[in-house]
Each structure stands twice: as structure tokens, then as C-alpha cells.
Curated annotation (Swiss-Prot):
Self-association and partners: Composed of two chains; the small (or glutamine) chain promotes the hydrolysis of glutamine to ammonia, which is used by the large (or ammonia) chain to synthesize carbamoyl phosphate. Tetramer of heterodimers (alpha,beta)4.
Organism in which the protein naturally occurs: Listeria innocua serovar 6a (strain ATCC BAA-680 / CLIP 11262)
Swiss-Prot/TrEMBL keywords: Amino-acid biosynthesis, Arginine biosynthesis, ATP-binding, Glutamine amidotransferase, Ligase, Nucleotide-binding, Pyrimidine biosynthesis
HAMAP family the UniProt entry points to: CPSase_S_chain
Limits of the Glutamine amidotransferase type-1 domain: 172-359
Domain of life: Bacteria
Substrates-to-products reaction catalysed: hydrogencarbonate + L-glutamine + 2 ATP + H2O = carbamoyl phosphate + L-glutamate + 2 ADP + phosphate + 2 H(+)
Pathway terms, separated by semicolons: Amino-acid biosynthesis; L-arginine biosynthesis; carbamoyl phosphate from bicarbonate: step 1/1; Pyrimidine metabolism; UMP biosynthesis via de novo pathway; (S)-dihydroorotate from bicarbonate: step 1/3
Active site residues of this protein: C247, H332, E334
Classification of source organism: Bacteria, Bacillati, Bacillota, Bacilli, Bacillales
Name the record gives this protein: Carbamoyl phosphate synthase small chain
Enzyme superclass (EC): ligase
Similarity comment: Belongs to the CarA family.
PANTHER family for the chain: CARBAMOYL-PHOSPHATE SYNTHASE SMALL CHAIN, MULTIFUNCTIONAL TRYPTOPHAN BIOSYNTHESIS PROTEIN-RELATED
Length: 363
């Protein structure tokens, strides 16, 4: 089997077996701790520009099917696994992981010590990495890798170019696409919403002209400070319409209200992150995928209050506006992959829109 190298910007490297596409690629190397859900993870637009390391030792054992994609065209730069299953077993399986990666033009590497790599990332933080042929000159690879700047316009790359509708007979929702997962749209469709998905740079005036019952801010990749267009829109919407944000939408909501965000050392990426609701003490296990978080101290003096925290590191996981019907969460209530413990948040959004219909927009 052809050999491939994963070189990190700190000089560490791993040599293993090539899987997927043969092309060379550079991205931010991160790790995901989920035991299942590799297909949804690879197709999640929030992973734009990243090389995903799966910590579970066997990936691909139930294959890949056409129904569980979170986006049609995956935006990941590469995939790292300990072992890629060659003979998947599942009645829904259509192609192997290796075949899928080749079809989508995603290079990968298998047969390396993913535990060692994960511990390195936990210690040093996320690092730039390059996947290339094992025969490449290591010094040249390292020099090239260190000279490359990772892109900062991720949302622009994954957002819809123009608005489109997903019809329903119920509430009219505008879903702002910062890299939305298909599962979020499906959750709204399940509740019979008429959803209009709009590009990331849609203005408040354009949204209000659609006369929706509520607005959702989607997940997405990268640093929220790279999306300044969103902040003025959020300020123009909150207080006029019910607002619900997820992941990147949560961070943008915080920035729009005067708080700050920061980059986590190695991020939260997995399906088993415990989150506590402060009002009730309820603890749920959540699906998460983010490299940035809201700075708790920066919320002092703003109109926002913390509603949820992450129990592993006590980072902010939920916010609500003190005056308006607007709330956000850092985690993924739509799951896929992961537990559906917090799926009820979509129902709370529906209730919020009912309150708006009765003319009571303040919290």
C-alpha cells in the first residue's frame, strides 16, 4: 500500500498508509472523540479547512450511505484514522469510507498512532498539518507548511450563494446559513416550518422584509470575528423577532451584544460533552464541534446572561438576552452525530414564536 506522511508545524510527523484521494493537502489538525458518526462529521461544514483525527480506533465499520450527509460537498481537508474498515457491515451501507474519500477528493492517512497524535494536540493545541507522499523531503515539507497561512474566509466558502426555501405549512423561519448542517433544516421541517435559508451576509432589513415568525443563526466554521457582517444584522433583528442561535450563531450573538470570544486550545469536538443548565441543574450530554468560545468575563455589563456551562472546563454553553426573546447554545441540539437529549430546544423555539404571535417579545 502507498505510504503517506502527516507533518505537523512543530516538526513532529507520522507515516502511515494512504487512503482517499492522492492529492496533497494542508489544514488545521483537530481531533474528534465520537465513537460513531464519522460520516456526519466529515460532511459537517463546520469542519471546513480542517484535518480530522478520529480517536476511535476503527472508523468506517458500517460504511457510508447517501442519506446521512450533513452537506453534499464535504469541506474537510483530510482524515486521520488508526484503522479504516475495508469490509463494512450494515444494511444501509453503499460504499466504504476509503471509496467515499476518493469520490469526494479527500486525502487521508491510516495506520498511525492516533492516541499519540491526540495527546500531542491536547498538549500543544491545534496545529497546522500537511498530508503528502511519504517520499517527500521532510525539511521542504516543513518549510512549505510553516509558510502557509490558513484561510480566514471559511463562512464565505460554505454559506449558500443565494436564498432558497424549504416549504411547510407552519411557522415561517429565516435560517441564516453560516455553514448550516442538513439536520438543523430537518428539525425545522419536522415541526412543519416554512424555512427560508439565506446567505450569511443577508441584512436585517432584508430579513424583516420576509415577515418571518422567527430567525435562526446556524452553525459554521472558523473565528466568529471573521464574520463582521453578521453583527449588525443580529442587532437589527433582536427585539423584533424571536432569535435562536447554534454554535457559531451563539458566538456571533455574543459579539453582537458586546461580549468577546477566544480560541480554545484544542476545541470541543465529540458527542459526549456534559452541559449543565444553571436554572434547573439539569445535565445533558451534547454533541459539540467548535474551536472558539465566549469569554465569560466579557459578559459583565452586557444584556446577556449565561444559561448553560460545560462541566469539563466551565466554558459558556448557553446565553439568553435579559430583555428580548433571544437565546443561543454553543452545542448542537440537532445532534447527528451524538445524543438527542437537547432536541427540545427546537420546541422551545417554536413556543417562542407562538409568544411573538401573541405580541409579547420581551423575556
Amino acid at each position: 500500500m502507498t505510504k503517506r506522511i502527516l507533518m505537523l508545524e512543530d516538526g513532529n510527523y507520522f507515516i502511515g498508509d494512504a487512503i482517499g484521494s492522492e492529492k496533497e493537502t494542508i489544514g488545521e489538525v483537530v481531533f474528534n472523540t465520537g465513537m460513531t458518526g464519522y460520516q456526519e462529521t466529515i460532511t459537517d461544514p463546520s469542519y471546513y479547512g480542517q484535518i480530522i483525527t478520529f480517536t476511535y480506533p476503527l472508523v468506517g465499520n458500517y460504511g457510508v450511505n447517501r442519506d446521512d450527509f450533513e452537506s453534499i460537498n464535504p469541506a474537510v481537508k483530510g482524515v486521520v484514522v488508526r484503522e479504516a474498515a475495508e469490509y463494512p457491515s450494515n444494511w444501509r451501507n453503499q460504499i466504504t469510507l476509503n471509496e467515499f474519500l476518493k469520490e469526494k477528493g479527500i486525502p487521508g492517512i491510516a495506520g498511525i498512532d492516533t492516541r499519540k497524535l491526540t495527546k500531542l494536540i491536547r498538549k500543544e493545541g491545534t496545529l497546522k498539518g500537511i498530508l503528502s507522499a511519504a517520499t517527500a523531503d521532510k525539511e521542504e515539507l516543513l518549510h512549505h507548511l510553516r509558510s502557509v497561512r490558513l484561510p480566514v474566509d471559511q463562512v464565505h466558502e460554505v454559506s449558500s450563494a443565494k436564498a432558497f426555501a424549504s416549504p411547510g405549512d407552519g411557522k415561517r423561519v429565516v435560517l441564516v446559513d453560516y455553514g448550516v448542517k442538513s439536520s438543523i433544516l430537518r428539525e425545522l421541517n419536522k415541526r412543519n416550518c416554512y424555512v427560508t435559508v439565506v446567505p450569511y451576509n443577508t441584512t436585517a432589513e432584508e430579513i424583516l422584509a420576509m415577515h418571518p415568525d422567527g430567525v435562526m443563526l446556524s452553525n459554521g466554521p472558523g473565528d466568529p470575528k471573521d464574520v463582521p457582517e453578521a453583527l449588525e444584522m443580529i442587532r437589527g433583528i433582536q427585539g423584533k423577532l424571536p432569535l435562536f442561535g447554534i454554535c457559531l450563531g451563539h458566538q456571533l450573538f455574543a459579539l453582537a451584544n458586546g461580549a468577546d470570544t477566544f480560541k480554545l486550545k484544542f476545541g470541543h469536538r465529540g458527542a459526549n460533552h456534559p452541559v449543565k443548565e444553571l436554572a434547573t441543574g439539569r445535565v445533558d450530554f451534547t454533541a459539540q464541534n467548535h474551536g472558539y468560545a465566549v469569554e465569560k468575563e466579557s459578559l459583565i455589563g452586557t444584556d446577556l446572561k449565561v444559561t448553560h456551562i460545560e462541566l469539563n472546563d466551565e466554558t459558556v454553553e448557553g446565553l439568553a438576552h435579559k430583555e428580548y426573546q433571544a437565546y443561543t447554545v454553543q452545542y448542537h441540539p440537532e445532534a447527528n452525530p451524538g445524543p438527542s437529549d437537547v432536541n427540545y430546544l427546537f420546541d422551545e423555539f417554536m413556543e417562542m414564536m407562538n409568544v411573538k404571535e401573541e405580541g409579547e417579545l420581551h423575556a
